[in-house]
């Protein structure tokens, strides 16, 4: 099972978090769950197309009532920001035009790009598109990830390798890559190389060590601190006038009318 399933989905909620964080139960057009999913796909497709040379490792999306926060993790933040922030402003304007909402754009630098599976896969695919021998490109990717501190790397390429008539798959592995272990921190990346013989798929698994309970608690605490706090006007259970902060009292009961005991003569 671990050899076939996506490592992120296999560990979702255990050691990995969602890359899209929002909630929707509305039936109004434009605010439905399916609308948000389709909009997320359009955002990611547009960013990956326009920032193809920027080395984008991953994109995270978080939504509030009237704002969309987009976090771009890139190995080359200078390309994304541009001179005096011109490129970042253009990206923000394009996203606002696409979504019709206010965009908060955060550009974050990847500290160790040679150990990021998505960037390793993209680098190998670019070499294959440049007519570099696939075995040489795979060995170069393995060596770079191991120098960056990875405990294990597996790289697989599939397609018409070397211009062969029949497609096949080949993989190289160095170190341990425990795909069945849920506590293992497995980074996964996929990219397609467009060659004159057709497309060649590149898959990369990078094992960065096991995630302990302390590491998981630290990551969750960092995520909570980075998210804006929600308003809770009645968190203490009090009721009253919000303008004067005075407690509201129940109105006094009116006395019921008493019927006359005697009858007029």
Swiss-Prot record:
Job description of the protein: Binds the lower part of the 30S subunit head. Binds mRNA in the 70S ribosome, positioning it for translation.
Binding partners and assembly: Part of the 30S ribosomal subunit. Forms a tight complex with proteins S10 and S14.
Listed GO MF terms: mRNA binding; rRNA binding; structural constituent of ribosome
A Pfam family this chain is assigned to: KH_2
Keyword rRNA-binding part of the UniProt annotation: yes
InterPro entries: KH_dom, KH_dom-like_a/b, KH_dom_type_2, KH_sf_prok-type, Ribosomal_S3_C_sf, Ribosomal_uS3_bac-typ, Ribosomal_uS3_C, Ribosomal_uS3_CS
Keywords, sorted A to Z: Ribonucleoprotein, Ribosomal protein, RNA-binding, rRNA-binding
Species this chain originates from: Clavibacter michiganensis subsp. michiganensis (strain NCPPB 382)
Protein name from the UniProt record: Small ribosomal subunit protein uS3
PANTHER family: 30S/40S RIBOSOMAL PROTEIN S3 (PTHR11760), SMALL RIBOSOMAL SUBUNIT PROTEIN US3C (PTHR11760:SF19)
């Amino acid at each position: 099972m671990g050899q076939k399933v996506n490592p992120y989905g296999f560990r979702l909620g255990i050691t990995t978090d969602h890359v899209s964080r929002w909630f929707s139960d509305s039936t109004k057009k434009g605010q439905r769950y399916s609308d948000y999913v389709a909009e997320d796909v359009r955002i990611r497709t547009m960013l990956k197309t326009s920032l193809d040379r920027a080395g984008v490792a991953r994109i995270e999306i978080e939504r509030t009532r009237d704002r969309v926060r987009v976090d771009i993790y890139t190995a080359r933040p200078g390309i994304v920001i541009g001179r005096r922030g011109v490129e970042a402003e253009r990206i923000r304007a394009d996203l606002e035009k696409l979504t019709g909402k206010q965009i908060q754009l955060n550009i974050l630098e990847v500290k160790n790009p040679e150990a990021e599976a998505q960037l390793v896969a993209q680098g190998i695919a670019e070499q294959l598109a440049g007519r570099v021998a696939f075995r040489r490109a795979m060995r170069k990717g393995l060596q770079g990830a191991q120098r960056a501190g990875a405990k294990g790397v597996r790289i697989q390429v599939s397609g018409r390798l070397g211009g062969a008539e029949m497609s096949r798959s080949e993989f190289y592995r160095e170190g341990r890559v425990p795909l069945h272990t849920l506590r293992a921190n497995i980074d996964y990346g996929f990219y397609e190389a467009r060659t004159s013989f057709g497309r060649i798929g590149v898959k990369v698994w990078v094992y960065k060590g096991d995630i302990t309970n302390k590491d998981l608690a630290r990551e969750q605490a960092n995520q909570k601190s980075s998210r804006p706090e929600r308003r809770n006007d009645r968190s203490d259970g009090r009721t009253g006038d919000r303008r004067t902060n005075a407690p509201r009292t129940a109105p006094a009961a009116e006395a019921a009318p008493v019927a006359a005991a005697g009858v007029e003569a």
